[in-house]
Amino acid sequence: MIRSAAGLILLAAAALAAASPTAAQPATPTSAPPAPATDWRAVDPASALLIETTKGRIVVELAPAIAPLAVARIKTLTRRGYYDGALFYRVIKDYMAQTGDKGARTFRSDLPNLKAEFTFRRTAATPYVSVGGVAGGDLGFVGATPVQVGADGEGWALYCPGVAAMPHYDDPNTANSQFFLMRRWAPSLEKTFTVWGRVVLGLDVVRAIENGEPPPHPDRMTRVRVLADVPAAERPEVKVLDPGGQAFARLLQQTMQARGPNFSLCDLDLTGSAP
């Protein structure tokens, strides 16, 4: 296992090896085409995190329908100011950026560890949009987070670029406060960590964070806020392409034709440029 100094697991060696899986990696995601305003969905400020960093601004849309405990924890710690000043202390090139440590090497908050939320149960209340079936289930989105749902209704997030998740020790029920942001597709991580959201603004910032374990000059989160807590005059308005709209349907068809059997939801970029 690969661990931090305190033993916190981020990725198993096998998972790192799968950074170059036999399945073809997604090409550069196909960006959302020009589309009318009705094809775009505004991100709810109450369900988004604004992360100011030394490299720029990141917005993560939260996914409480997938991981309600993790989302509640992230919001609680954010509102305490817990993440302000935290380092990106473990950053693997072309893979992920891990943060939540202020240099004290405690690796956790004073709150109890969280129960693993590697999967979720799709119900009538789940804000799920299907984009097509696969063997034994269905592919779709919960908000901006790509997911797969089995025939039995059990769903799990796909580890596309921008996905936000929580690391843990050997015991899967030990996620607490730290998180990592994916820089690329990593299908081997599915159902092994709790996914709590996805970057909808600033993936370029995530990829610009200085690499290293630890980096020689680590970047940090200077300030983290729930987007709804940001004064309206300062609050960025973030929109993503609605996967239930016609523009998305065209994007999906175009991308599936281009990628053929190598198609993945990670090939799709829902951010684009909203009107």
Regions found by a protein language model. Name each.
Residues 1-4:
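Positively charged n-region of N-terminal signal peptides that target proteins for export
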Residues 7-17:
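Bacterial N-terminal signal peptides
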